[in-house]
C-alpha cells in the first residue's frame, strides 16, 4: 500500500490527485507574499487542486556573494505566518542549519531540506526533532536509489512523514537533465514523490554571477512527470519573473499557470485511473 502523508485536510500520495506546492522563490516582502498567496489560493480553489504555499526567507546558496538572499528568518517567518493565517493554507519553507529548525517549525507545516544539504545528517536530525513533515530535495549529484540512505537516516531519527523531491541531475557543466525514471525509483521507497518543474530547468551558475534557466521547458517536464504518477508538483511562480531577485529565468509566469494546471489535472486523472 502506497504511503499517504496527511496534512490538515490534504492527503499526499503517489496514487492520489497531485498537490501543488507553489509560490515565489524568495519572500520579497509582506505585500508581495500576500498578493501571490491570494492569487494562488483562488486559482487552486477554482481548479480544485490541493495547495501548499512555498517561499524562502533565505537563499543561502546564491551563486554570487552579491546575490539578494531574502528578508531573513525573523521577518520571513512573520510574513509566512501572516500568509498562513489569512489564507488558511499550509506552509513549506527551507531550512539551512540546525539552529533554524525549531523556530521555523513554529510556522511551517513542512520543513524542506535543500538539495545541496540532503546528506547533512545533523540537519536531518534537527528537522526530525521538530515532529514536522520533512521534505528532502534530491541532490543534483545523487542517484535516485541513493535517497534510500536519506530515508534510513530520517526513519532512524523518528520521522514518520517524508516527502522526496526530484529537481534534476547534473549533466556536464551549468546544466541539469530530468530522468523521469528517478520518480518511479524513489517511489519504490514508499515515499510520496514531488517533481520540481522549475528548478529542473536551471542552468546552475550559467549566467556567471547567477543561475540561468529556460522556463519554456517547465510545462514539458511537468507533463512528463505527471504522466509517471507523482504525489505533488512543485513550481516557483512570480507575476514578473524577469525582474525577480532570484531564479527569475526558471520561474513560471503567474498568468500562464492556470492553463498549465488544467492540462496537468487531465494528465493526472488519466495516469491514476484504476
Swiss-Prot record:
Key words of the record: Cytoplasm, Lipopolysaccharide biosynthesis, Transferase
EC nos: 2.5.1.55
Subcellular location: Cytoplasm
The keyword Cytoplasm appears for this protein: yes
Entry's transmembrane regions: none
GO molecular function, one term: 3-deoxy-8-phosphooctulonate synthase activity
The protein's name in its UniProt record: 2-dehydro-3-deoxyphosphooctonate aldolase
Top-level enzyme category: transferase
Amino acid at each position: 500500500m502506497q504511503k499517504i502523508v496527511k496534512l490538515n485536510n490534504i492527503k499526499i500520495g503517489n496514487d492520489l490527485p497531485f498537490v501543488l506546492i507553489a509560490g515565489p522563490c524568495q519572500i520579497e516582502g509582506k505585500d508581495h507574499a500576500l498578493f501571490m498567496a491570494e492569487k494562488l489560493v483562488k486559482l487552486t480553489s477554482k481548479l480544485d487542486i490541493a495547495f501548499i504555499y512555498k517561499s524562502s526567507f533565505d537563499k543561502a546558496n546564491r551563486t554570487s556573494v552579491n546575490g539578494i538572499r531574502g528578508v531573513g528568518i525573523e521577518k520571513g517567518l512573520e510574513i509566512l505566518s501572516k500568509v498562513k493565517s489569512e489564507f488558511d493554507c499550509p506552509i513549506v519553507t527551507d531550512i539551512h542549519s540546525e539552529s533554524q529548525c525549531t523556530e521555523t517549525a513554529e510556522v511551517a507545516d513542512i520543513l524542506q531540506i535543500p538539495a545541496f544539504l540532503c546528506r547533512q545528517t545533523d540537519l536531518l536530525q534537527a528537522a526530525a526533532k521538530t515532529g514536522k513533515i520533512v521534505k528532502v530535495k534530491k541532490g543534483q549529484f545523487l542517484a535516485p536509489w541513493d535517497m534510500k540512505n536519506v530515508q534510513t537516516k530520517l526513519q532512524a531519527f523518528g520521522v514518520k512523514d517524508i516527502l522526496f523531491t526530484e529537481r534534476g541531475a547534473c549533466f556536464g557543466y551549468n546544466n541539469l537533465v530530468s530522468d523521469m525514471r528517478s520518480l518511479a525509483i524513489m517511489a519504490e521507497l514508499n515515499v510520496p514523490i514531488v517533481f520540481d518543474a522549475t528548478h529542473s530547468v536551471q542552468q546552475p551558475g550559467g549566467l556567471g554571477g547567477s543561475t540561468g534557466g529556460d522556463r519554456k521547458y517547465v510545462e514539458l517536464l511537468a507533463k512528463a512527470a505527471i504522466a509517471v504518477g507523482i504525489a505533488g508538483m512543485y513550481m516557483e511562480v512570480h507575476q514578473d519573473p524577469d525582474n525577480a531577485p532570484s531564479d527569475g529565468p526558471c520561474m513560471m509566469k503567474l498568468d500562464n499557470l492556470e492553463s498549465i494546471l488544467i492540462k496537468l489535472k487531465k494528465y493526472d486523472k488519466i495516469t491514476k485511473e484504476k
